[in-house]
A protein has these predicted regions:
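Bacterial N-terminal signal peptides
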Residues: 9-18
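Bacterial N-terminal signal peptides that target proteins for export
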Residues: 1-9
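Nuclease and nuclease-like effector domains acting on nucleic acids or nucleotide cofactors
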Residues: 31-284, 292-322
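Short amphipathic alpha-helical segments
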Residues: 5, 20, 27, 318-322
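Sec-dependent signal peptide cleavage junction
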Residues: 17-33
Length: 322
């Protein structure tokens, strides 16, 4: 039987003026922990970007002002379709930098990792910033890291800052392993995204500031991310609800499950996408919006899942929805 595949996507963010790149890497969930990591590389070349040599105090003041004035830009979001939306992160690969040529010598580099960790055992989200490495003739005179978690009940609606930190490293504090983190305890299902602002400055060059934003994720009250599942045959991904606070209906108030829903869906699927030659006995027909939350038996609200995915990934997520 052909299998449905998970899709893990990678994000790349780059900034002009500074030779700064960022790579985001998502790890598979392990022991109830899912981690998203972005690696940010900030380099200043020997040719410099400021003609006037500035003092250490000037650089620190400029860096603080840049960091303060940088806004938290929201992420781009997919277009909802009715009551559902595909949350699957899209691949991003954007490079607006000028590639250094043979005459450009990189003198100073700092690498900072930012982390977004979902821990089901603690029912919490941790976000952190860590200096991974410092390379070059001189280290920065100031590094400022800041991170904010934003949450909302409506995918396309308003988001509020719920957990934030700012940390300034100077002098001997600027070292490999220097870290700042904060943990937020989940109590309700929410749409969540993280925004990081990073600033670094070396004497002799204007400070550089970078803002990076994750995708928007749907996370239940147990810090369990909504499963990202893709059907390679139909080309369709499992949609998510657009609301994190849907009303729960008593059994007597719900739409009744169609007893012939399985056969109807199989006929509909083959008619729309062609015969995948699956062993349908190993598949479950899942209601994207469950009946207990106002879902119905329409074909657009159904999605075929392997029994393992349905019972071990999707159903457990919904048990922690409210």
């Amino acid at each position: 039987m052909k299998k449905f595949a998970y899709s893990i996507f990678f994000m790349v963010f780059l900034l002009t003026a500074w030779l700064w790149t960022s790579d985001a890497e998502a790890s598979q969930s392990k022991d109830g922990i899912t981690t998203y990591k972005e690696t940010h590389v900030l380099e200043v070349d020997e040719n410099g970007h400021a003609k006037e040599i500035q003092s250490k105090s000037d650089i620190i003041d400029q860096a603080r002002q840049q960091f303060k004035n940088r806004p938290h830009d929201p992420p781009q979001r997919n277009m909802p379709h009715g009551d559902t939306v595909v949350l699957q992160p899209s691949t991003k690969n954007k490079n607006t930098n000028k590639t250094p040529d043979a005459n450009t010598k990189v003198a100073n580099t700092i690498v900072i990792d930012t982390l977004f960790k979902l821990d089901q055992s603690k029912k919490a989200i941790t976000h952190s910033s860590t200096i991974r490495s410092i390379i070059g003739k001189a280290k920065p005179v100031i590094v400022i890291v800041g991170s904010t978690l934003f949450v909302g009940d409506d995918y396309a609606g308003k988001y509020n800052a719920i957990s934030t930190y700012t940390k300034e490293f100077t002098g001997s504090q600027i070292k490999v392993g220097a870290t700042k983190s904060k943990t937020y305890k989940m109590v309700k299902t929410k749409f969540v995204y993280k925004s990081d602002i990073l600033t670094a400055g070396w004497v002799g060059s204007a400070p550089g500031t970078k803002q990076s934003t994750t995708e928007t994720y749907l996370v239940n009250k147990n810090a369990y991310q909504y499963p990202q599942i893709h059907n390679s045959h139909s080309g369709k991904s499992l949609p998510a609800p657009t609301k994190a606070n849907m009303k729960w209906y008593k059994p007597e108030d719900r739409v009744k499950r169609d007893k012939d829903i399985r056969n109807k869906y199989i006929r509909w699927y083959i008619g729309k996408y062609g015969d995948p030659k699956w062993d349908w006995s190993g598949l479950d027909i899942h209601h994207v919006i469950p009946l207990e939350y106002g879902g119905d038996n329409k074909m657009g609200n159904l999605y075929a899942l392997t029994r393992t995915l349905h019972q071990q990934e999707v159903s457990p997520w919904w048990r922690g929805y409210r």
